Amino acid sequence: MTPVRDSKTMQCDGFMTIPFPAELCERMTRHIRGHIRHATGISVLENAPVEELTSAVAALSDDAFVEQFRKPLRIFPHELSGAVAEWIGSLADFLGGSRCGINYISPSEHAANPALQATSHDVFWRCVRPGKPDVGQPHADFQFWEINRGTPLDPPSPFPYDERWKIWLPLLGCDATNSLEVLQGSHREDIPLESIQTKYGTKPAIRMDWLAANEHRFFCPLPPFQNHCVLFHDKLVHRGPANATSHLRISGELTILLKL
């Protein structure tokens, strides 16, 4: 792979697709199936296809889904997130830094899920149901860090860092019509950022007229999908589109902290 600092595509576009370890993908999907089995009370198979998982989740009411699929419950277990963090640590040279890692979970998330540890890494997954409003507004990830700074949602860092990068990982039910969409080159632009109040707290947003004028620029940077992920700048505007398919969309996420 071309190192990030040498990649003209990364510098201009703000993203690139890189391989993700297949063994970690398998462990992550195995855990997700187990969570769905526990949350729904339905004995889905160990290797259940996304259609079977969709039927199980559809048995939950909207309120039950929100409760059982809260973000603190979607953080991967300590050992698994640690294995992902170990792989991320091997990418320092590729990213052009001296050290890289993943932030820990926030104090609020630890309190909400005592099965985790204060030093559990913030590697989590999302589950978007078909035809449901399970997605947020287009945003750039650095907005979350600004909004949450100094609050119980502010995640501790294992070391001082200079840059943040994001990884989005397709796991189940993801295709070119139903996956992350990015706004190419937006990390180099002056974006009219906003924040909005929701029933889940303050969330990042972007001024609606600007989004409308730039709607045509959003696109999915994948394929390939299997055992690959999107690495992107934390100021790149992106979104998870509404799920217009007949099955769940399940993906993984993490933030990379890079010391130059």
Where are these regions (language model features)?
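Short beta-strand His + acidic residue motifs that chelate non-heme Fe in jelly-roll/DSBH
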Residues: V237-T245
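Histidine-centered catalytic micro-motifs
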Residues: V135-W145, V237
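N-terminal auxiliary "cap/dimerization" subdomain that precedes the catalytic jelly-roll/cupin core
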Residues: M1-G101, P224-F225
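A short hydrophobic beta-strand segment most commonly corresponding to one strand
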Residues: L169, Q184, H247-L260
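Signature of the catalytic double-stranded beta-helix
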Residues: A59-K132, Q137, R149-D162
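Double-stranded beta-helix
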Residues: Y161, D175-V237
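Short, conserved beta-strand element in jelly-roll/cupin
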Residues: I147-D175, P224, T255-L258
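Extracellular structured ligand-interaction cores
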Residues: F15, S120-D122, D162-W168, T177-S179, ...
